[in-house]
A protein has these predicted regions:
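Internal maturation/activation junctions in enzymes
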Residues: 2, 274-369, 382, 389, ...
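Active-site rim segments in enzyme catalytic domains, especially the processed small/beta chain
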Residues: 58-75, 79-81, 227-229, 361-427, ...
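Short, small/polar residue-rich loop motifs at catalytic or cofactor-binding pockets
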Residues: 240, 347-350, 411-413
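Glycine-rich phosphate/pyrophosphate-binding beta-alpha loops
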Residues: 254-262, 350-354, 366-377, 430-437
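Extended C-terminal subregions enriched in glycine
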Residues: 359, 407, 441, 450-501
Length: 533
C-alpha cells in the first residue's frame, strides 16, 4: 500500500490545502472557476477539464492557446484511458528545407506543426462529456469578449514574450494592440479569440480542421511561404493509447507513451527502487544524490531513444524492463556524481489542470504552445496563436526524432496519474514546465507516494532540476548545508530564485482519499488555484 498522507506542513506556502467531493486545480483562478461552474451545472470531471482548458487559452496565453497540442489521462470510474492529441508536421516537410541549419528554428512558420488541442477537447467531450461543447466554451468566450485582469505572473511573461515576438506576423495586433504588452491588473480583451472559440464550439471543432478557421490558417501560411495546408489540418487525428505503467511504492505510476517524455519518470523511479530509495527522505543528501543520478540516466535514454513511437527503434516498454533498469542502476556511484551523456533540454511554457468529481471520475490534462506564446505566429482576426512544437525535432537524419513530414515531434508535455495497490485511482498530477516535467513527476511521486507528504507540502517543497553533465539547478530555498554536501559529491550546483525565470515548473495535484473524497493542491510558484465543493 502507498503511505498514508501526513497533513502537517514542513515548508512555507502561499496556498491552503483543499478538500472536497469535487475538485479542480490549475494555474489560473478564472480558469479553475470555469471548470467548477461546469460541475455546479451537473457536468462531470471531463466537462470541467475541457471548460478549464478552453478558459486557459484566454487567460494564460503565455503558455497555451487554441493553436496548442494536448494530452490527457482519464479515469472513467472503471479504467484508465490515454489520449494523445498532439499534431504532426506538415506533409511537405523534409530535412532539405532546413539545410545549413543546426536546429529547427524556435520562432516563425518553420516551427509550426498542426495544432491538436481543439481535437483533444472534442474527443474528450464526445467520449466522456455530458454537457454540450457550447456550454463548456462559454466561460472562455466571456473572458475573451468581456475581458479579464492580467495576473502577476502572466503580466511578467507577457512582457517577455512581447519583447521576443513583437515582430512576428500577427502577434502584436492580437497581443499588444496598444503597442505594448498589457500590464498586471489591466483588463485585456480578445474578441477575435471569442469568435473563434464560439465557432469551434458550434461546429464541434470542424471549423478548425475543415472549415472557416482552417482556411484562414492555411491562407496565412501560404501568404508567408509556409508549408502548413488545409490538407494537413484535415488529416489530423487523435490517438487513444495504452498507458505505460511502473509499480512504485505499493501502487503504480501511469504515463502516456512517447512521443512525450513521461517514460523518463518511470525509468528514474525504476532505477531508484533498485537503489533502495525508500530508506532516504527526499530532502536528505543521499536521497537527493540518488534521485539526481537516476534522473540523469533517464534523460540520457530519453534523448537517445524517444520520439514518435511509430519511428522508435524498439517498443518503449523495453526501457522499463527490470533487467534493463537494474543494469542502469548499477552505473550509479552512491557517493559521487557521475557523467552521463544526454542533450541539454529546452525551456518552455505549458498549462496543466486536473479535475475530479463525486462519481469518481478523474482527469489529468495538459496543453501547451511549447515555448511561451509558441511560434509567435497569430492568424489575423482569429486570436489563434500557433505553437512552435516543430523545434522539438532534431536534424540528425539517423535519430528516431529526425524531422520528417506527417510526423509527431518529441514532446515535453505530459499528464501524470497514479493508482493505489488495489487498482483504484490515487492521484492525478502534473508539473508543467518543459524539461522540468518528468523531473517534477518523479519528485511528486517520491514525496507523496513513498513518503506520504500531503500534496500541498509536496508542491511547496524545494525543487531541483538536472540541466546537463553534472550541473543541477536548485531553488534558493534549499538548505545551505545540503547544497554544500551535494557539491562535495561532485554535483555542480547552481542556486536560482524559483521566481527568477519560472524554470521549476508548476504543479497541480488532486489526491483521492480512501473514502472517495479529494485533497487538491496548487502551485505556490504560480497564480493558480485549487477549488473544491
Amino acid at each position: 500500500m502507498t503511505k498514508a498522507l501526513d497533513f502537517t506542513t514542513g515548508y512555507d506556502s502561499r496556498r491552503p490545502l483543499m478538500m472536497g467531493h469535487n475538485a479542480v486545480a490549475t494555474s489560473q483562478p478564472l480558469a479553475a472557476q470555469a471548470g467548477m461552474k461546469m460541475l455546479q451545472l451537473g457536468g462531470n470531471a471531463v466537462d470541467a477539464a475541457i471548460a478549464t482548458a478552453m478558459a486557459l487559452t484566454v487567460v494564460e496565453p503565455t503558455g497555451n492557446g487554441i493553436g496548442s497540442d494536448a494530452f490527457a489521462i482519464v479515469w472513467d470510474g472503471e479504467k484508465l484511458h490515454g489520449l494523445n492529441a498532439s499534431g504532426r508536421s506538415p506533409a511537405s516537410w523534409h530535412a532539405d528545407l532546413f539545410a545549413g541549419k543546426t536546429a529547427v528554428p524556435e520562432i516563425g512558420w518553420d516551427a509550426v506543426t498542426v495544432p491538436g488541442a481543439v481535437s483533444g477537447w472534442v474527443a474528450l467531450a464526445e467520449r466522456f462529456g455530458t454537457l454540450p461543447l457550447t456550454t463548456l466554451a462559454q466561460p472562455a468566450i466571456d473572458y475573451a469578449r468581456d475581458g479579464f485582469p492580467v495576473s502577476p505572473l502572466i503580466g511578467h511573461l507577457w512582457q517577455r514574450g512581447y519583447n521576443k515576438l513583437k515582430d512576428q506576423p500577427g502577434f502584436s495586433a492580437c497581443f499588444a494592440p496598444e503597442g505594448r504588452a498589457p500590464r498586471v491588473g489591466e483588463i485585456f480583451r480578445n474578441p477575435a479569440q471569442a469568435n473563434s472559440l464560439e465557432l469551434i464550439a458550434k461546429t464541434n471543432g470542424d471549423a478548425f480542421y475543415r472549415g472557416e478557421l482552417a482556411q484562414k490558417i492555411a491562407a496565412f501560411a501560404k501568404a508567408h511561404g509556409a508549408h502548413l495546408t488545409e490538407a494537413d489540418l484535415a488529416n489530423h487525428r487523435v490517438d487513444w493509447v495504452e498507458l505505460l505503467s511502473r509499480d512504485f511504492a505499493g501502487g503504480s505510476v501511469q504515463e502516456l507513451p512517447p512521443n512525450g517524455q513521461g517514460i523518463a519518470t518511470l525509468i528514474a523511479l525504476g532505477i531508484l527502487e533498485q537503489c533502495g530509495i525508500e530508506k532516504h527522505h527526499p530532502d536528505s543528501v543521499q536521497g537527493l544524490h540518488l534521485s539526481i543520478e537516476a534522473m540523469k540516466l533517464a534523460l540520457a535514454d530519453l534523448d537517445r531513444y524517444v520520439a514518435d513511437e511509430e519511428h522508435m527503434e524498439f517498443a518503449a516498454k523495453a526501457l522499463l524492463s527490470d533487467h534493463y533498469l537494474k543494469s542502469r542502476a548499477a552505473l550509479i556511484n552512491h557517493d559521487k556524481a557521475s557523467d552521463f551523456v544526454y542533450g541539454s533540454p529546452t525551456q518552455s511554457g505549458t498549462v496543466y489542470l486536473s479535475a475530479a468529481d463525486s462519481s469518481g471520475m478523474m482527469i489529468s490534462f495538459i496543453q501547451s504552445n511549447f515555448m511561451g506564446f509558441g511560434s509567435g505566429i497569430v492568424v489575423p482576426d482569429t486570436g489563434i496563436s500557433l505553437q512552435n512544437r516543430g523545434c522539438g525535432f532534431v536534424l540528425d537524419p539517423k535519430h528516431p526524432n529526425a524531422l520528417a513530414g506527417s510526423k509527431r515531434p518529441f514532446h515535453t508535455i505530459i499528464p501524470g496519474f497514479a493508482m493505489d495497490g488495489n487498482g483504484k485511482p490515487l492521484m492525478s498530477f502534473g508539473v508543467m514546465g518543459g524539461p522540468m516535467q518528468a523531473q517534477g513527476h518523479m519528485q511528486m511521486a517520491l514525496r507523496i507516494m513513498l513518503h506520504g507528504q500531503n500534496p500541498q507540502a509536496a508542491i511547496d517543497a524545494p525543487r531541483w532540476r538536472v540541466v546537463q553533465g553534472r550541473e543541477v539547478v536548485v531553488e534558493s530555498t534549499f538548505d545551505r548545508n545540503t547544497i554544500a554536501a551535494l557539491r562535495e559529491r561532485g554535483h555542480q550546483i547552481v542556486v536560482e530564485d524559483p521566481l527568477q525565470d519560472y524554470n521549476f515548473g508548476g504543479a497541480q495535484v488532486i489526491y483521492r482519499m480512501p473514502e472517495g473524497h479529494y485533497v487538491a493542491a496548487t502551485e505556490s510558484r504560480k497564480d493558480g488555484q485549487a477549488l473544491v465543493s
